[in-house]
């Protein structure tokens, strides 16, 4: 029965490798409890999945999309992008905020030569040795 079913499915899904992926995915769905769309006739889940594809009770495109979705680790949600005018306005506001920043907002760092750094390191006291650690 499975041989005839595979031959029937090749008309619906032309690539045999893709057919194996789709039927395997559908068989896993059936084993997880998703209702079947054809009579079981005492067949195992992979054969039922092939029969569903052959009888076109399931769309191969929908099954393929579901397979891809199940394999994705990160599903992107398409969000509407901001209009270019909104982006330009936001950039101008940020630039104005930076220009208006006062002197007290600017962070300065002390400069130190290599010799001063080495002298500072030599002046450090080693921590006491602890028996517990």
From Swiss-Prot:
The record's listing under InterPro entries reads: DNA-dir_RNA_pol_omega (IPR003716), Pol_omega/Rpo6/RPB6 (IPR006110), RPB6/omega-like_sf (IPR036161)
Family, per entry: Belongs to the RNA polymerase subunit omega family.
Q: Which SUPFAM superfamilies match?
A: RPB6/omega subunit-like
Lineage of source species: Bacteria, Pseudomonadati, Pseudomonadota, Alphaproteobacteria, Hyphomicrobiales
**Stated name of the protein:** DNA-directed RNA polymerase subunit omega
Q: Which top-level group of life is the source organism from? A: Bacteria
EC number(s) of the enzyme? 2.7.7.6
| Catalytic activity line of the entry | RNA(n) + a ribonucleoside 5'-triphosphate = RNA(n+1) + diphosphate
Give the UniProt keywords, A-Z: DNA-directed RNA polymerase, Nucleotidyltransferase, Transcription, Transferase
The record, for Gene3D superfamilies, names: 3.90.940.10
Task: Give the record's GO biological process terms.
Answer: DNA-templated transcription
